[in-house]
Every structure is written in structure tokens, then in C-alpha cells.
């Protein structure tokens, strides 16, 4: 038992345990049993929205509701309270002469946080509030701890993230944010299902990290006596399924990267990866735009999205620009020109762009320029395509300029929201790219990956031309809920 549960009980906790014992003495289970509701709070509000006090009285409608007791007032023989369920709150009006003395005692002794079931007549008060005039109250569950004092809006950030259940009880805005997240994911699934994609599941435990540039979490399989890694991407397994003939697949799932934490990064996060046979990166651009716009429309409607005071024109066609053109437009440096690594490093020094030890190709310098000068300017949805081969080990080379790949990233509000490309399906080229990554790893690039020989073997059986995509679900949820930190869209973010 943890020290937290061995703590000395305070006065309120002692009183609540005494009430629990009293319920048992009356033959009432303090933690209840199954209870049949006829409606939730919002259903009743919607159903009777257009009826005034007299009309409701004439209809003589009844309902059975249940929820957590969150407010309570009144003295003597009459009381008012609010029950909170998943949809919101509804008032209950309790009279001793309507429920009986014994039943009224259950209400009277109920504490905030307890769960009650209420049967009664649907009514409207003189103030116009829809309420249930109780005819019977059922005790459903005893809360042995009082709700936080700041119940109507938990404000302590540490408590919000560590004890999300308290945040959900007390912050309706937070509750609705996670409902919105669920809807976003459901709508993405719906969009892809309707386009003939098959949702699949691939392993979380891998023998070799691959499919992304990231440091993995390492674990050990006792029975096999081998070290394994938690997946840093789902890419290579999904492309094996394209080899197997599935043609259109996607997976929404947890990814694990042993890296730093900040406003937009958590060590475990949710991504969606999508692969489509006989498609290229241009087709995947169209698909990406469709996914993002469909998700936005489902929770925000047809118009633009407001994020932290900036209007994001997510409902309009996304801008498309080559990485080299974007760099030239901002810095004047033209990387279309052929140049040696030495020349590129000299330009980087002139522009004060840091050069890492593992930058062994001009493509590394080009990417560094993009990150240094261009990313921070990308506010409206923008597809940046044409990444250098050096930083795109799984993407197909552009047939017209082999220095670059048919790859794109989607940027909104300076952040990357998606990464996609025409997949490399040449096993010989893929092996040489893997070998270059392995060399970079030896030179100190912690994010470079090793060689997945099994994946090379799969490619040798033949993979059709394929387009692939990865989108960070958490960042998309941040955008569509106007949230500034990833922890506010993760129910249980990583904590120390």
C-alpha cells in the first residue's frame, strides 16, 4: 500500500466513513448496484427546451436520472441539488413529503461527490431552470474523499495532470476537450474507412527501431532473452502489408520516443500512418488535406479555425512549396545550384547556421537552413515538399532531380503536423540508405536507425508504387481545441 493511502484520515474523511457505516446498518450498499436511467441531463434539456413551467406541469412527464452530487442547498423539509453526468448538470428538487422521511434522510446525509439516482417529475422552477422533482432517491456510491475546495475549476496544474479524474469532474471545458479529441479520431477513421482503407494493428515491440529518426525505449524479453525496443513508428510493418497485397491500410496507435518533453512533445503519443498502393506523394497531399479538413469540419464547422487569436484558413486549399524555393525566398540562398559540401558549409557559416558533425551531405545543410529560417514563418497550412535524400531515408528520389525526394511535411502555426512521401520500393537503394543511417549513428546521430534486413527482404518480393503518410494526432487535437500544451490533450501525460 502506498504512503498516500496510509495517510492519517482527516475529519471529513472520518465523517464520510461513518456515513458509509450508517448506510450499511440501514441495509443499503454504500457502493450501490446497477441503476436504470431513462435519460441524461442534456437529453432532458433538449427534449423540453421549448416548454415553459405551466406546459411542463400539464404534460406530467417523468424521468429517471443518475449522477454525481455536485451542489446541495436547503434546510428542513426541502432541498435543491445538482447532479452531474457525462453530458452536464441538472437540478433536482427534493421535498420530504414527496419522497418520504426515510428516503429524504438519504438525500439529507448525502455528501458532495456521492452518486445518486433520482426518479421524479420533470418540471421548471420559477426561475425557469429545468429540474426533476424527486419522488424517490437511490444511493448509488459513497465518495470517501471530499472534492477539492476549488471544485468549480481545478487550477493547480500538477493536480490537473496527475489526477485527471479530478480535472474531469471539476473542469467542464477540460471534459469537453477530451470528448472533442475522441470525435476527431472517430471522424478520421470514418473518412479513411469510406475511402476503402483497412484499419490494422502492428506490433508495439520491435527487434530494430525503424521508420523514423528518433531514440527508442529499450526493454528486455525474458522468455526469448533478447533486447527489444518500443516502436518509434508503425511504417515498416505497414509497408510489409502493402507488399502482402492489402493496398490501402492505416493504423492509429501509440508511438514511443525516448526524447525530451515540451509543449508539443510527450514520450508516448498517438499517430496515424496511412499507406496507399499505386499512389504518389501528390495523391497523399490531397488525402492529407482531406483528412485534416474533414476532422476540422466535424468539430469546428465549415469556416476557418481560430488558434490562439490567429485565424487558420484550414477550410481553404493548402499552400504547396518546394523546400529549396522556400529557403531562397527568405534567405536569398539558392540550393538549386550544384555545390560541394565544403561550399555549402561555407554558406552555412556565413548565415550562422550550426553544422553538426554528422552533416556529411549538402542535403543536411539544406535541411538545417529550412529549420533555421523557414519553419518559423509557416503559419497557414503549408505543404513543404522536396526534402533532400540525406534526411529522407525511406522516401523515393525525385525522378527529375535525384538530390531530392518526393516527400512533404505539413506545417501549421510553425509546427509539423504531417510527414509523407512516395515510398522507396527499390530494395537495393533502401539498403544503401539504411547503411548511410547506420554510419550517421556511428558518427553520433542518436536519432539515426540501424538496418532492418527483414524489411529489405520484404521489399525484394516486390512492393507496388506507394504513397505513405504520418500525422500526429495530439498536435491536431491541440490545434482544433485551441490548446497550447500537449498535456492538455493527453488524458494521462507523462509525469516525473
Swiss-Prot record:
User: Which CDD domains does the protein's record reference?
Assistant: LysRS_core (cd00775), LysRS_N (cd04322)
Could you tell me what reaction this enzyme catalyses?
tRNA(Lys) + L-lysine + ATP = L-lysyl-tRNA(Lys) + AMP + diphosphate
Q: Where in the cell is it found?
A: Cytoplasm
Q: How is the cofactor bound?
A: Binds 3 Mg(2+) ions per subunit.
The primary location reported for this protein is cytoplasm
Required cofactor(s): Mg(2+)
* A Pfam family matched in the record: tRNA-synt_2
Residues that bind Mg(2+) 2, according to the entry? 416
Q: Which family does it belong to?
A: Belongs to the class-II aminoacyl-tRNA synthetase family.
State whether it acts alone or in a complex, and with which partners, per the record.
Homodimer.
What this protein is called in its record is Lysine--tRNA ligase
Organism name: Streptococcus pneumoniae (strain Hungary19A-6)
